[in-house]
UniProtKB/Swiss-Prot annotation:
Domain notes: Consists of two distinct domains, a catalytic core and a N-terminal extension that is involved in tRNA binding.
GO molecular function: ATP binding; serine-tRNA ligase activity
Taxon lineage: Bacteria, Pseudomonadati, Chlamydiota, Chlamydiia, Chlamydiales
Family: Belongs to the class-II aminoacyl-tRNA synthetase family. Type-1 seryl-tRNA synthetase subfamily.
Residues annotated to bind L-serine: T231, A232, E233, E285, S384
The protein's name in its UniProt record: Serine--tRNA ligase
Spans through the membrane: none
Entry function: Catalyzes the attachment of serine to tRNA(Ser). Is also able to aminoacylate tRNA(Sec) with serine, to form the misacylated tRNA L-seryl-tRNA(Sec), which will be further converted into selenocysteinyl-tRNA(Sec).
GO biological process, one term: selenocysteine biosynthetic process
Chief site of localization: cytoplasm
Record-listed E.C. numbers: 6.1.1.11
UniProt-listed Pfam families: Seryl_tRNA_N, tRNA-synt_2b
Cellular compartment(s): Cytoplasm
């Protein structure tokens, strides 16, 4: 959520900043509604003052044994007006809140301005793209002999986009997750296994709704709707909603492992088959609550952790500074870490690390008290540390051998009983 006071003060400047993300944004209706709401509040306060004055006159009239009927009628008329004003005010405030809730975060000044991902800027490349002496296979082809994934059986139970891991695929997945969690703990992150279902107001607080309403799996629990989380960012942000933190306790670094659920699997087309785009996947999420002064330090820390992971896994990767047209709704700046997938002949995002400023904390009402006792909204940051499906794809495709076997990265071997290679089933 943006600060309405800044929009009132600098409407043209705010509109121009928002149009960098979405050129169709106009603040005209919002400003008109805001003006109406403030006028209604002022009129209501005037009526309340008038009613109070009349009530005083009624009391005096009764003490003096005078006829107070006209005064009482005046008070009753004001009461009727106030009821009408209150109804109109509630309606106008709801409309204003909805408009405010649909405005994205302002992009930082150093973010490239572009309508889409074509404006993304590669800021770092690391590692060599592998060259093979044989035609490299897509991970779905590799799996035909490895048999560590199953796409057909879960399609029976759940539909397309819901793969299952099996055999050594399970062990490799858990090796990855254990390695990732250990890495987060080593860097001072508090580990969490949080709930997977959240209330609607928690989705609102993280910025998922109302902008993307209808894109999440929903469960009806009596009179309350609960939503399966698309990312642990949602629940970690919600942990401190409507709280006042102490400045000396900041920054707070959290890391959570969760399954994540998204309805848009398959949106990338048939070429993104297999694990590249799915409805359910595992992810370790990093999240931080900071002061504005701590924000950049936390941001670089998160980026550094992601780079350390990809370097230790010896995967070729690049860092991309996302343009305004490719950034998320809540982010003011995002850097994507992208790994090379030989099966796609392209780099694919495995982590997005974003600064959100006070955008989420205004929605969640998460503040901190400084040494002088003054209250401020916290800054929030989030980043994948990492999502495993594409990471697993990257390992299978980059470490594949001509015979269809896959070498296990050295960093993961301690978590797989020092196993060094995945062999095709026919070779076992």
């Amino acid at each position: 959520m943006l600060d309405i006071r800044l929009i009132r003060k600098e409407p043209k400047e705010c509109e121009a900043r928002l149009q960098k993300k979405d050129p169709s944004i106009s603040l005209e209706r919002l400003l008109d509604l805001d003006k109406n709401v403030r006028q209604l509040k002022a009129d209501s306060e005037s009526l309340l003052a008038r009613r109070k004055a009349l009530s005083g006159q009624i009391h005096k009239a009764k003490v003096a044994n005078e006829d107070a009927t006209p005064l009482i009628q005046g008070v009753n008329a004001i009461a009727d007006q106030l009821v009408a004003f209150e109804k109109t005010l509630q309606e106008q405030e709801a409309l204003l809140l909805d408009l405010m809730a649909r405005l994205p975060n302002y992009p930082d000044e150093d973010v490239p301005v572009s309508p889409d991902k074509s404006g993304n800027k590669i800021i770092k490349s690391h590692g060599e793209i592998p060259t093979f002496t044989f035609p490299p296979k897509h991970h779905v082809q590799l799996n035909e002999k490895l048999q560590i994934l199953d796409f057909k059986l879960p399609a029976k139970t759940s539909g397309s986009g819901w793969p299952a891991y099996k055999n050594e695929g399970v062990l490799l997945e858990w090796a990855l997750l254990t390695y990732l969690l250990n890495k987060q703990q080593a860097h001072g992150f508090q580990l969490w296994l949080p709930p997977l279902l959240v209330k609607r107001d928690i989705l609102f607080g993280s910025g998922q709704i109302p902008k993307f309403d209808g894109q999440y799996y929903r469960v009806e629990d009596g009179e309350q709707s609960l939503f399966l989380i698309p990312t642990a960012e949602v629940v970690l942000n919600g942990f401190h909603s409507q709280e006042i933190l102490n400045e000396q306790d900041l920054p707070l670094y959290y890391a959570a492992f969760t399954p994540c659920f998204r309805r848009e699997a398959g949106a990338g087309g048939s070429h993104e088959r297999g694990l590249v785009r799915v409805h359910q996947f595992h992810k370790v999420e990093m999240f931080a609550f900071t002061t504005p002064e701590q924000e950049e330090i936390a941001y670089q820390k998160m980026i550094g952790i992601v780079e350390e992971i990809l370097s230790e896994l010896q995967l070729p990767y690049q860092l991309s500074l996302l343009s305004t047209g490719d950034m998320s709704f809540t982010a003011k700046k995002t850097i994507d870490a992208e790994v090379w997938l030989p099966g796609q002949q392209a780099f694919y995002e495995v982590s997005s690390i974003s600064k959100c400023g006070d955008f989420q904390s205004r929605r969640s009402e998460t503040r901190y008290r400084d040494a002088q006792g003054k209250l401020h909204f916290v800054n929030t940051l989030n980043g994948s540390g990492l999502a495993t499906p594409r990471l697993l794809v990257a390992i299978l495709e980059n470490y594949q051998q001509e015979d269809g076997s896959v070498v296990i990265p050295h960093a993961l071997r301690p978590y797989m009983n020092n196993q060094e290679i995945l062999l095709p089933k026919t070779d076992r």
